[in-house]
Amino acid sequence: MKLTINKNSAKWMQLPRDVLVGHGVLEEIGDVCRDLKLKGNALIVTGNTTRDVAGKRVSTLLENAGSSTEMVLTCRATMEEVDKIMQKASETGATFLLGIGSGRSIDLAKLASTRLEIPFISVPTAASHDGIASSRASIIDNGKNASVQAQAPIAVVADTEIISAAPFRFLVAGCGDIISNYTAVLDWELASRLRNEYFGEYAAALSRMAARVVIENADSIKPEHETSARLVVKALVSNGVAMSIAGSSRPASGSEHMFSHALDRIAPKPALHGEQCGVGTIMMMYLHGGNWQEIRDALKKIGAPTNAEELGIEDRYIVEALLHAHSIRPDRYTILGNGLTPSAAEKVARITKVIS
């Protein structure tokens, strides 16, 4: 039998080399850099709050390990901020970057380091979404949220002592982002069947497993609890790995994410990304004919929003976001197809009790 190899089927997988998750692991960041042969000038990308939470300590630890450090403070995840970081890196001769924060600083360091062609380390101070280990960066470009391909971190250092001390709302949002894997994978399977899109079994299985772990442990996810933080961080890292294996965000981003991005554009005051994705997952699971009640019940146990009122968003914006969600990424086929009718959008939101 002759084996035919399709050269176009080859995929590049970029995964973190070191992942440290646990109590006090921030203190090991110097060892991580030595292990990865990272030396020279480090540029720390962080925010005002996270500078005090972890940024200053990381700077001290790196200098004790023999590196020199500079710090750049960020305020918004915009392309202008990326340019600012790149300029600072060039001025200081940075040989590697560290993103320290709950998401924004990590995404900025991720994209800036990709363009500079130097490695970066992800140091999350909260577990609010799966960007901590993925090769995607959420950036505001020309006033609109965009998901941009970038490099994965060379290492992730997630100190659960720090993460568990962050506002519990961030951890809850991270759970919503993970649980949304269920409908993301269903959308991916649908696109494979109807549009002959590539579907990766391994990436899909890893994505589903992360969501299942969070749902099965929903009762035990509590505030200021390091075990909870560890569980959620590991699931978020698994999401990042699944996306790297797939070569796209498909395993963790489908119609529920498109709904969330539509809300970002429409609602005057959007909620957290993971919170909106969780609510979106309830409705998209209904459209898929799945067990949407299980999704809703798990989110309730964790303390996540399950309706418009809990999101702090008016009912009409939920319906409007459902109507526009399919157009957020026209190239990505989902259960939304070519869009819902106004009556269908209102029906799914009412049946799932997302609106009253």
Curated annotation (Swiss-Prot):
Its EC number is 1.1.1.261. Its main location: cytoplasm. Signal peptide: none annotated. NAD(+) binds at G103, R104, S105, I106, D107, T125, A126, A127, S128, S134. Zn(2+) binds at D177, H257, H273. It is found in: Cytoplasm. It is an enzyme of class 1 (oxidoreductase). Keywords: Cytoplasm, Lipid biosynthesis, Lipid metabolism, Metal-binding, NAD, NADP, Oxidoreductase, Phospholipid biosynthesis, Phospholipid metabolism, Zinc. It catalyses: sn-glycerol 1-phosphate + NAD(+) = dihydroxyacetone phosphate + NADH + H(+); sn-glycerol 1-phosphate + NADP(+) = dihydroxyacetone phosphate + NADPH + H(+). Binds 1 zinc ion per subunit. Its cofactor is Zn(2+). GO terms for molecular function: glycerol-1-phosphate dehydrogenase (NAD+) activity; glycerol-1-phosphate dehydrogenase (NADP+) activity; metal ion binding. Pathway: Membrane lipid metabolism; glycerophospholipid metabolism. One of its GO terms (cellular component) is cytoplasm. GO terms for biological process: glycerophospholipid metabolic process; phospholipid biosynthetic process. Substrate binds at D130, D177, H261. Belongs to the glycerol-1-phosphate dehydrogenase family. NCBIfam families: PRK00843.1. Catalyzes the NAD(P)H-dependent reduction of dihydroxyacetonephosphate (DHAP or glycerone phosphate) to glycerol 1-phosphate (G1P). The G1P thus generated is used as the glycerophosphate backbone of phospholipids in the cellular membranes of Archaea. This is Glycerol-1-phosphate dehydrogenase [NAD(P)+]. It comes from Methanosarcina acetivorans (strain ATCC 35395 / DSM 2834 / JCM 12185 / C2A). The lineage of its organism: Archaea, Methanobacteriati, Methanobacteriota, Stenosarchaea group, Methanomicrobia. The gene is egsA.
